[in-house]
Amino acid sequence: MNEFSLFASCPKGLEYVLADELKTLGAEVLRTNPAGVEAKVDLAGAYRICLGSRLANRVLRLLQSTRTATRDGLYQAASEVNWSEHLRPGESYWIAAFGSSGDIRHSRFGAQVVKDAINDHFRDRDLELPVIDKRSGVQTVQLNLAKTITLGLDLAGRSLHQRGYRQEGAAAPLKENLAAAILYRAGWPEICGEDGCFVDPMCGSGTLVVEAAMIAMNIAPGLLNPHFLFEKAPWHDPEVWRGVYEEAMEKAVLGKRRWRGAIFGCDLNPAAIRTAKRNLSRAGLDRWVKLETASAMDFTPDTEGCGQRLLVCNPPYGERLGQELELRSLYRALGRRLKTAYGEWKAGIFTSSVNLAKEIGLRADKQYHLYNGPLATTLYLFDVYGNRPEAETPRKPQNASLEGISEQAQMFRNRLSKNLAKWSKWAKKQQLSAYRIYDADMPEYAVAIDWYDGGIIVQEYAPPKSVDEEKARQRLLDVLEVTPAVLGIDGGQLFLKQRKKQKGMLQYEKTDSSRKERTVEEHGCRFWVNLSDYLDSGLFLDHRPTRYWIQKHSSGKRFLNLFCYTGAASVHAAAGGAATTTSVDMSQTYLSWAERNFHLNKLSGPHRFVRANVLDWLKAEHNSYDLIFLDPPTFSNSKKMEDVLDIQRDHAGLIEDCMRLLAPGGVLIFSCNYRRFKLDSGIEQRFAVENHTAASIPEDFKRNERIHQCWHIRHSA
C-alpha cells in the first residue's frame, strides 16, 4: 500500500513531543497544531504508531478535507472518498461527529450528510449498503467540523491512553499518555538508558511507575491491549501487522532482560498501593517495580548501583482556597525532603498551583505547560544538586507550623502578635470577649480579624483592580495560615467572610449549612454569635460603645430598637433597667435570635419582639418611647418590603417618624454605616442634633474611623 496521511491527536501542550515521537516510529511529520500532529506514513508506520505511541490519543487515517462549510460542500467532499476501500458491503460502521462549522451547526446533521454520501457510493456500484450501528460498528468514521472539515478512519477504535492495565484508579487519576509525556519532559528516556533510578513518592494507583517501567524496558504500550479496528479494514495486511507486532515483542523481551536500573513507588494510602500492585501485575511489571506503603517524607529508596536518579510526582493540587491552604505545609515538607534526601537527583513536580510550587523552595530549571484534561498545569523540573540551600543561621521559630513562610508573611505574623498582646490586655479590662485584633494594619494584608472567645472571623476587603489577583490570593492564604498559629487556635475555628457584590439579596444571606455557635461577653451581657452560617456574626462589634451608653442611660426608660437585628442593644437596655423594650425587625430568624439572647441573660418582663416592615410599623405605631435606637441598613430590597430602602434618600422621613414617637426629653440614636452618608440639613434645623461619631467608635476600631456615623437627636427646647 502506498503512503497516506494520518492525524494523531494528543492532550494540549504535547504536540511537539508527539511529533518527535512519531518521527522515531517512522513517520514523516507534515504539520502540528494544538490538537495533534499530521504525518505521512506507510502501512507499517501506521501499525507501529498504534502499537507504540505513548503520547497519542486517537489515530486517524485522513480521507478528505474541505473548507466549504455547507451541506453540499460536505457531501461533495465525502463523495470523493473511495468508501468501498475502507468499508465492506453490508458491514456495520459508525460516524463519530464533533463540532460545528458554517451552515452545519449540529454534528448529527453533518453525520447524516456523510452517511448519505457513503450510501450513494455503494448504491452507485450496486453494492449492499453498509449499516449504521454504534454498538457493533466494525469501523468508525470520524467527522471533525471546524474551520477545516476533515474526514478520517479511526485506526485504533479507542484512545491510545487506554493501555489496559488500569481498570481502577485512585483519586484524581493521571491519564497514561500524560504520565508518559511528563516522563519524556523530565528526561527519563535518557536517564533510564544509563540504568538510572526512578521514584514516585506519591504514586497513587501507580500510573507514573508503570509508564516509567515501560519506557525503561522499551515495551510498546499497545502490547498490553493489542486489538485495533484496522485489523478489520479491507486494506489490512496481516503479514505486515505480524511483522510489526513481533518486532515490538522482541524489543520488550530484550528490554526486560537488559534493564539494570530501579523503579520505586510509595504512597501513604494502603488502598492506593494495593491498586498500584494490581495495575503492575496486569502490565506484567510487578517483578521490576518496588512498591511500599509509606510517607513521601520518610521513604528512602535503595539506589545503590544506579546511574542518574529521577524523582517525579503529582502531588494534590488543591483547587479550592481551603485545600490549597492545607497543602502548603505538604509542599514545603516535600521541598525539605528533596534537599535532605535527594541531594544529587533530578526532580519533576507536576501541579496546577503556582503558589504551591513556590512553597517547594527550589528554583526550577525548566517549566513545561501542560493540561490535565481541561486543567492548566505545569511540570517544574529541578536539579536538586544545584539547588542545595545556603547554610542558615540557627533561629527559633515562633511556631513550628509556620516554618518556611515568606518574609512578608513573617512581617504580618509579627504585627498580629503585637496586636494580640495589646488588644487582649485591653479587652480583659473592658470585660470583653469579642473584639477586633487586626484591621488592615499592613496595607498588603487588607483584612479585618475579629476574635470571638476562641473563634476567629477573617473579613477580606476587596482589593483594588490594580492589585494582581494571584498576589491577593497568595496574601489571603498567608493570613489564613498565620492567624490560627499566632492566636493559638485550631484552623477549624477560623471563618473567612468575603463580601461580594450580590444581586437581589441582602448581604446577610446564609453562607454555610453548619452551625458554629458560641457565646461572648460584653460589659456584663452575653450574646449568642454564629461564626459560620452568615456573613455577619450576630453582633456588630463597632456598635459596642453605643450599646454600653444605652445600658447606662436606660433605667426606667421605654426603649425602642428599630432594625433590631439580633437584639443586642435591647439586651443592654433591659440589663440597664429599661421599663420596657420593643424590638422590631422583618426577619423572624433574627427576632428568634434576639429572644434567645434575652433568655441567655435571664431577662424577663415587658419585652416585645415585633416582626414587621419598620417603615410601615413606624407609621402605624402610637406609643411613646424615651430612648430609640435606629440603625438601618444602607440598602434593602427584601421581598417582604413593597419599597426599596435607600438610607441616603429615605433617612429624613425615617427620623421624622421616629421623632413623632419620641417622648419629650427622650433621645433618638441614629447610626449609619454608609461611608458617603450626608445628614439632611432639614433634620438639623428642626431638631437638636449632636454628632456622637467619635465617642461611638470603640478603641479597637479607631483604625477605621469611617466605619459608621452616629448622632443623638432630641426635640428642640
From Swiss-Prot:
<feature type="domain" description="THUMP">
    <location>
        <begin position="45"/>
        <end position="142"/>
    </location>
</feature>
<keyword id="KW-0489">Methyltransferase</keyword>
<dbReference type="Pfam" id="PF01170">
    <property type="entry name" value="UPF0020"/>
</dbReference>
<protein>
    <recommendedName>
        <fullName>Ribosomal RNA large subunit methyltransferase K/L</fullName>
        <ecNumber>2.1.1.173</ecNumber>
        <ecNumber>2.1.1.264</ecNumber>
    </recommendedName>
</protein>
<dbReference type="GO" id="GO:0070043">
    <property type="term" value="F:rRNA (guanine-N7-)-methyltransferase activity"/>
</dbReference>
<dbReference type="GO" id="GO:0003723">
    <property type="term" value="F:RNA binding"/>
</dbReference>
<dbReference type="InterPro" id="IPR002052">
    <property type="entry name" value="DNA_methylase_N6_adenine_CS"/>
</dbReference>
<dbReference type="GO" id="GO:0005737">
    <property type="term" value="C:cytoplasm"/>
</dbReference>
<keyword id="KW-0694">RNA-binding</keyword>
<keyword id="KW-0698">rRNA processing</keyword>
<comment type="function">
    <text>Specifically methylates the guanine in position 2445 (m2G2445) and the guanine in position 2069 (m7G2069) of 23S rRNA.</text>
</comment>
<dbReference type="GO" id="GO:0052915">
    <property type="term" value="F:23S rRNA (guanine(2445)-N(2))-methyltransferase activity"/>
</dbReference>
<dbReference type="InterPro" id="IPR019614">
    <property type="entry name" value="SAM-dep_methyl-trfase"/>
</dbReference>
<keyword id="KW-0949">S-adenosyl-L-methionine</keyword>
<comment type="similarity">
    <text>Belongs to the methyltransferase superfamily. RlmKL family.</text>
</comment>
<keyword id="KW-0808">Transferase</keyword>
<dbReference type="Pfam" id="PF10672">
    <property type="entry name" value="Methyltrans_SAM"/>
</dbReference>
<dbReference type="InterPro" id="IPR054170">
    <property type="entry name" value="RlmL_1st"/>
</dbReference>
<dbReference type="InterPro" id="IPR017244">
    <property type="entry name" value="23SrRNA_methyltr_KL"/>
</dbReference>
<keyword id="KW-0963">Cytoplasm</keyword>
<dbReference type="InterPro" id="IPR029063">
    <property type="entry name" value="SAM-dependent_MTases_sf"/>
</dbReference>
<dbReference type="Pfam" id="PF22020">
    <property type="entry name" value="RlmL_1st"/>
</dbReference>
<dbReference type="InterPro" id="IPR000241">
    <property type="entry name" value="RlmKL-like_Mtase"/>
</dbReference>
